[in-house]
């Protein structure tokens, strides 16, 4: 099983201002300093979110993922490694010859 994050969370989705307020960080006299501080805070938030998501299996910020399986765990169902799942865009299977076939949504919903 390979789970790939296709896109990082939007920078606007990170609560940098809330973290800055919680930490009671003062604003500096130079805007460049504030921008560098905001970038550092965003990096700390991303690291914290990644740690929490890895330990809990819960996604905190919505973004697309791609799941690739070598085989189904159970023919009737396949548990997903992360939750909550907002939507499943497609289910495709690849045969031994490398041909990809899309499975109709009615067959997997």
Name every feature range the model reports, one short phrase each.
Residues 1-109:
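Divalent metal-cofactor coordination and adjacent catalytic microenvironments
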């Amino acid at each position: 099983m390979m789970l790939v994050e296709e896109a990082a969370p939007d920078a606007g989705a990170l609560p940098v201002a809330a973290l800055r307020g919680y930490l009671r960080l003062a604003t500096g006299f130079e805007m460049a300093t504030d921008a560098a501080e905001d970038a550092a805070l965003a990096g700390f938030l991303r690291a914290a979110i990644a740690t929490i998501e890895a330990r809990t299996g819960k996604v905190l910020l919505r973004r697309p993922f791609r799941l690739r399986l070598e085989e189904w765990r159970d023919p009737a169902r396949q548990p997903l490694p992360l939750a909550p799942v907002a939507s499943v865009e497609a289910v495709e299977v690849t045969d031994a010859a490398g041909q990809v076939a899309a499975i109709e949504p009615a067959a997997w919903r």
